[in-house]
Regions:
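Intrinsic disorder at enzyme termini
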Residues: 475-580
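N-terminal catalytic cores of NTP/NDP-binding nucleotidyl/phosphoryl-transfer enzymes
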Residues: 2-76, 95-110, 115, 132, ...
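A glycine-rich helix N-cap at a beta->alpha junction
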Residues: 77-92
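Phosphate-backbone binding interfaces of nucleic-acid-interacting proteins
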Residues: 545-681
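Structured secondary-structure scaffolds
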Residues: 2-49, 101-105, 149, 155-369, ...
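Cys/His-rich short segments
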Residues: 116-169, 173
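Helix-rich, typically C-terminal accessory recognition domains appended to large enzymatic cores
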Residues: 121, 330, 342-379, 396-504, ...
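Secondary-structure transition/capping motifs at alpha-helix termini
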Residues: 1-3, 37-44, 64-65, 69, ...
Length: 681
């Protein structure tokens, strides 16, 4: 018997700055689907995930929580692992960068790179973004803020060790050009080449002295190893790499077959990581796939925006496999996917309840109703039309395996699961074409009826076997109801393997019952209210740690200083009548989306929800608010201002602001929670 081919797949390790949301969870579900699929094909899969637990941001979060960094990451890592387990991920190894073996190996790697001249000591002076753990030059900033997250950056100057990135740049460019599948999708490759590699690489800071929560540099312990040299190396340290002699597990599995990561960290995995590996004289991973984001209503999901959907809330409301189905089905290959609670309910009802759940329930129920649960192949094909219908069903069913395989080889998982559901759709159509309830009334058609139910049962068995990589619990429930087992992948292009005479369950289970939005949405509103309160409390603690005043609901960022401000006198304008005032319509609005206006350095374009409508409003507040900060804010809006174009962009209202003596602006917001659309009187 030949040895199974190996397949080593990894996810990015989750950063332990907080509980992972459904966008983070998507990655582990996607990786799990790929890992399960490869196992079904006969591969010896090693699937690794875990948590990234060092850095300044974590140190500050722990301070805010009043506990040690280790206690903090223990809590968050435990939460990550709980959620990964909850969504039924079949990982083989869960790593933590605080594990002793990882820390020991990172120290060895750092020393090796230093000894061979790839790392040198210098000093850094520039701008630092704490949330992103990234240094930037002035020219790299966007509107004076971090180009990755849009937050404020702080001046930083410190002694540091640097890695000579430029030494390996040409070699990496050549590798990428000669290995077209290395970076996928291709658009990510083009971005890395054109934006980073071809313009030239700067040497990379690989140590810090301004915080202590990290792996100390062995020979210079006031330095801690900077996040990427620590985090990225988990892919080799945790399978047994050692500069002094690596394990059999490492020799078997490296290079990785697939690094599955978010598109926002492609640069680190396709530039920094390959160069580190070249310096260590190790082969590069075969492929790095930068998957798109799952956006909440069209905007990036972020705890800082307070628009987070968590996996455990989705699982509680919809179930594990419904959650898995949604994130796998709604995420395209290259473009960002959209998630809203309404869309989840719609997809649950249309696909899981109507197409799949209804099919299985009808088939099992009819087998019990007409034949006491016995499924028997009689070979009765009926007339020529019915024979053609049977042949078409069998062609679709037996052809699905190869269609799924083609999609999965290209990592087009959403397309693969769509192919499986096309099989189930064909089965539902087959029921309409063969009308078992009509056949049941004709004694002469009993053999034909039995054959129809056999064909359905066989088709569903094949479909469930293909579904198992994506929705494992559901697939197992289906074959249990049919009193059979999941098929081997090699047999999924064959029709007729279901054992004739098998008795299906006499107690069919409804796999997915239809949901009503009016039952689900009140629960969603409770979740959102609790999350908002939790987020605001966390921000207040962090602000205190950073020495900043926390921002109250209507008080603005300088609430703590408001008592010290001098009163302002301004020139009075011409009086207006009450009738004039009544012409103005003011309402509370909620900003659901915001972006900078391309042709202006001052303007932001916001989509503002006001009651049941959404207005586009352009405001000159870009100096004071980033687009990210705007999303989720409740604001006061003049809603009946005549539309006008600002910098070529249509504006349909005005956001109300206060202005101090220096001309600084602050949005006016309700002092207490108010619904979008509430009148201002």
């Amino acid at each position: 018997m030949s040895e199974k081919p190996k397949y080593y797949i990894t996810t990015a390790i989750a950063y332990t700055s907080g509980k992972p949301h459904i966008g983070n969870t998507y990655e582990i579900v996607l990786a799990d689907a790929i890992a399960r699929y490869k196992r079904s094909q006969g591969y010896d899969v090693f699937f690794q995930t875990g948590t990234d637990e060092h850095g300044q941001k974590i140190q500050e979060k722990a301070e805010a929580a009043g506990i040690s960094p280790k206690e903090y990451v223990d809590q968050i890592s435990g939460e990550v692992k709980r959620i990964w387990d909850m969504v039924n991920s079949s990982y083989d190894n869960f790593v933590r960068t605080t594990d002793e073996d990882h820390e020991k190996c990172v120290k060895k790697i750092f020393k090796k790179l230093y000894d061979q001249g790839d790392i040198y000591k210098g000093s850094y002076e520039g701008l630092y973004c704490t949330p992103c753990e990234s240094f930037w030059t002035e020219s790299q900033l966007v509107d004076g803020k971090c180009p990755d997250c849009g937050r404020e950056v702080q001046p930083a100057k410190e002694e540091a060790y640097f890695f000579k990135m430029s030494k390996y740049a040409d070699r990496l460019i050549d590798y990428i050009n000669t290995h077209p599948d290395f970076i996928q999708p291709v658009s990510r490759k083009n971005e890395m080449m054109n934006n980073f590699l071809l313009p030239g690489l700067q040497d990379l800071c690989v140590s810090r002295t301004s915080f202590s929560w990290g792996i100390p540099v062995d020979f210079d312990p006031k330095h801690v190893v900077y996040v990427w040299l620590d985090a990225l190396t988990n892919y080799i340290t945790k399978i047994g790499y050692d500069p002094d002699g690596s394990s059999e597990l490492f020799k078997k599995n490296w290079p990785a077959d697939l690094h599955l990561i978010g598109k926002d960290i492609v640069r680190f995995h396709t530039i920094y990581w390959p160069i580190f590996l070249m310096a260590l004289d190790l082969p590069l991973p075969k492929q790095v796939f930068g998957h798109p984001w799952l956006l909440q209503g069209g905007d990036k999901m972020s705890k800082s925006k307070g628009n987070v959907i968590y996996a455990d809330d989705m699982v509680r409301l919809f179930g594990v496999d419904a959650t898995r189905y949604f994130v796998l089905h709604e995420m395209p290959f290259e473009n960002d996917g959209i998630i809203t609670w309404d869309l989840v309910i719609e997809r649950f009802n249309s696909d899981l309840a109507n197409i799949l759940g209804n099919l299985v329930n009808r088939t099992v129920s009819m087998s019990n109703k007409y034949f006491d649960g016995i499924v028997k192949s009689t070979g009765a094909t009926g007339d020529a039309d019915q024979t053609a219908i049977d042949a078409d069903l069998k062609a679709v069913v037996t052809g699905t395996r190869d269609k799924v395989a083609k999609k999965m080889e290209g990592l087009r998982v959403a397309d693969a699961i769509t192919e499986v559901f096309a099989l189930f759709r064909r089965c539902n159509k087959y029921i309409d074409e063969t009308t078992p309830w009509v056949l049941a009334k004709d004694e002469a058609q009993q053999d034909r009826l039995a054959e129809v139910l056999y064909n359905l049962t066989e088709s569903i068995t094949i479909g469930a076997s293909l579904l198992h990589s994506f929705l494992p619990e559901t697939a197992e429930k289906i074959v249990a109801q049919l009193n059979t087992t999941l098929r081997d992948f090699d047999d999924l292009d064959q029709f007729g393997l279901y054992e004739s005479g098998t008795k299906v369950t006499d107690k069919p289970e409804i796999l997915f019952g239809r949901l009503k939005a009016e039952d689900v949405m009140p629960e969603v509103e409770k979740i959102q209210a609790a999350q908002k309160a939790e987020f605001e409390a966390e921000q207040a603690k962090l602000a205190a740690v950073e020495g900043k005043a926390a921002c109250g609901c209507g008080a603005g960022e300088n609430a703590a200083d408001s008592a010290d401000l001098e009163p302002m006198d301004i020139e009075a304008k011409e009086e207006i009548t009450f009738d004039d005032f009544e012409k103005l319509q003011f309402q509370v609005g909620e900003i659901v989306k915001c972006e900078a206006v391309a042709k202006s350095k001052k303007l932001l374009c916001s989509q503002v929800k006001i009651g049941n409508q959404t207005k586009q409003i352009v405001s000159g507040i870009r100096k004071y608010y980033s687009p990210e900060e705007m999303v989720g804010k409740k604001v006061m809006v003049l809603v009946n201002l005549k539309p006008a174009k600002l910098a070529g962009v249509l504006s349909e209202g005005m956001l109300l602001c206060a202005e101090d003596a220096e001309g600084n602006l602050a949005l006016l917001t309700p002092e207490k929670p108010m619904p979008a659309g509430a009148p201002i009187e």
